A protein has these predicted regions:
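C-terminal substrate-binding subdomain of Rossmann-fold SDR/epimerase-dehydratase oxidoreductases
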Residues: 1-110
Length: 110
């Protein structure tokens, strides 16, 4: 499980920390409080790109021996000290990213 955070939300948190004396010498996890598996993310992307018109099939490699399977950051300090909560959902991030990537592909840039 991983937490995916929109860069604009991260920038907001950084600005809040820069302008808050209570943030000096403190550490913050700047993240959403919602976790997703890689399969969850793949399904979301697939549905946004293809809808239900095509079946999604998975192929798996062996997992990395020392991979952390579940990463759940505590966002308590960011909320309590900075007043920060990530606002942008992963679905909203994908709605912005997918057209941008499609455009770059159509221009031959990727």
């Amino acid at each position: 499980i991983r937490h995916y955070t929109y860069a604009g939300d991260i920038a907001t948190a950084i600005l809040l920390a820069l302008n808050n004396e209570n943030a000096i010498n403190k550490s913050f996890n700047i993240s959403t409080d919602v976790g997703y598996t890689v399969i969850d993310v793949a399904k979301m992307i697939w549905e946004k790109v293809h809808g239900n018109s095509k079946d999604l099939k998975f192929a798996f490699d062996a997992p990395f021996q020392y991979d952390v399977k579940c990463r759940i950051p505590s966002v308590v300090n960011a909320k309590n000290i900075l007043g920060f909560e990530a606002k942008t959902t992963l679905s909203e991030v994908l709605d912005e990213m997918i057209p941008w990537i499609k455009n770059l592909v159509s221009l031959g840039k990727i």
